[in-house]
């Protein structure tokens, strides 16, 4: 099992599992700094499962806010827009949607994510 870095920016890193687990060909690990958001997406065909490996996050969906800490998991049903805010530095493991599904963004939720990240980045400077 190997991790491949696929993206790194001011929020942290995103890596994916590149060997094994053929049932879920994309297993992604998000390392996110406190105060920043990830996501703003929607997956049309697959549910998404997540588990917090380190830290504290809050998942946001149209159904509400869901606080998660180390060891807790969450399932996001298909067709549910979502994002998470990292309350502390965090590491989140997610799996389920295929790579092509992960590309679709939900316009309203993505706008929220971009605004929060912009405000946080401005505040840090």
Positions of the model-derived regions?
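A short, N-terminal "cap"/entry segment at the start of jelly-roll beta-barrel domains
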Residues: 1-26, 39, 124-125
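Double-stranded beta-helix
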Residues: 2-10, 87-125
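Conserved short histidine dyad/triad with adjacent acidic residue
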Residues: 28-44
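Glycine- and acidic-residue-biased ligand/ion/polar-headgroup-sensing regions
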Residues: 45-58
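A cytosolic small-molecule/anion-sensing beta-strand core signal
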Residues: 53-54, 70, 88
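Structural motif
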Residues: 56, 81, 89-91
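Short acidic-glycine-tyrosine-enriched beta hairpin
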Residues: 62-81
């Amino acid at each position: 099992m190997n991790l491949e870095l696929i993206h790194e920016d001011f929020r942290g890193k995103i890596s994916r599992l590149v060997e094994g687990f053929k049932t879920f060909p994309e297993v992604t690990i998000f390392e996110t700094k406190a105060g920043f958001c990830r996501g703003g997406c929607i997956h049309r065909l697959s549910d998404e499962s997540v588990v917090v490996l380190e830290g504290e996050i809050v998942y946001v969906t149209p159904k509400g806010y869901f606080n998660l800490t180390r060891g807790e998991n969450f399932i996001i049903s298909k067709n549910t827009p979502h994002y998470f805010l990292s309350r502390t530095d965090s590491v989140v493991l997610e799996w389920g949607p295929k790579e092509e599904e992960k590309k679709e963004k939900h316009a309203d939720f993505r706008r929220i994510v971009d605004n929060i990240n912009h405000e946080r980045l401005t505040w840090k400077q």
